[in-house]
């Protein structure tokens, strides 16, 4: 298996949250095809309720790549994604007390109830459910594991541990995720942010803890300081696989350097437009 086959690319969702950055329609489709050629395991896009462009049929009809559509935990949003034909549905809710109480003004019991309702809706439609645990890095283990257990019991495929504010350090990532991995009833995915320049290092720590799914973006673009860079994930996850499995070498036949370089050119062009739109400092 190629290293990128364990990566969910979120360039078209989290990446496009970079201030001033917007991809043209032809760029979005080009990125879809190039990321497929590059060998990523899945791509993530915003749901039609958030971005109407996602309702176009070419996004939901992909046969050889999982297109995971990201939704708020709102049944009406999920319904729009299902009607558009998507079979891989992601739903996200906060699990930290700070976000539950101060951001949403609800209780953890409400979060669990909403999660169960949303997953059941997805599964009843015959689609696969993926769950995001927003601000998991600042949540208690108790809250996270209760949330994960309910997700597993209700039929979710995988749960994303999100370091939403990018506050974790590698030592903490490895120790905490190793502990959670031992008790989590479904596969874990790590989603790091780069606020302190540690996103890629944190993903490597997560890999060392036994987490085999990761999310990242082309050139590490995203909100605030961005996410883990896709090229960095390709190189380091490949090296990690070789190191942890003596005699094993990543299958680079499933990776296209040409395709990845082409995605970077598209993203760089969009970044240049964003720089001019909001006058952000930019380094090529």
State each model region's role:
Residues 1-284:
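Catalytic cores and adjacent flexible loops of soluble metabolic enzymes
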């Amino acid at each position: 298996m190629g290293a990128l086959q364990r990566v969910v690319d979120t360039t078209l969702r989290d990446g496009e949250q970079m201030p001033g950055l917007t991809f043209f329609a032809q760029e979005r489709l080009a990125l879809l095809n190039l990321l497929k050629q590059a060998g990523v395991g899945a791509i993530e896009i915003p749901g039609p309720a958030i971005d109407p462009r996602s309702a176009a049929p070419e996004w939901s009809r992909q046969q050889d790549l999982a297109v995971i559509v990201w939704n708020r935990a709102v049944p009406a949003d999920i319904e729009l994604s299902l009607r558009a034909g998507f079979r891989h549905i992601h739903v996200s809710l906060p699990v930290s007390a700070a976000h539950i109480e101060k951001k949403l003004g609800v209780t953890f019991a409400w979060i669990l109830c909403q999660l169960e309702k949303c997953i059941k809706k997805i599964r009843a439609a015959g689609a696969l459910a993926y769950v995001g645990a927003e601000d998991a890095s600042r949540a208690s283990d108790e809250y996270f594991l209760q949330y994960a257990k309910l997700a597993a019991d209700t039929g979710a495929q995988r749960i994303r541990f999100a370091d939403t504010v990018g506050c974790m350090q590698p030592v903490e990532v490895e120790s905490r995720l190793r502990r959670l991995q031992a008790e989590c009833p479904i596969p874990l995915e790590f989603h790091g942010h780069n606020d302190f320049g540690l996103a890629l290092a944190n993903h490597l720590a997560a890999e060392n803890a036994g987490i085999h799914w990761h999310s990242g973006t082309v050139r590490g673009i995203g909100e605030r300081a961005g996410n883990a860079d896709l090229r960095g994930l390709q190189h380091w996850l490949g090296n990690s696989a070789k190191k942890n499995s003596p005699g094993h070498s990543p299958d680079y036949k499933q990776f296209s350097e040409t395709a990845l370089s082409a995605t970077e050119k598209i993203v760089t062009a969009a970044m240049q437009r964003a720089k001019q739109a909001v006058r952000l400092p930019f380094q090529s």
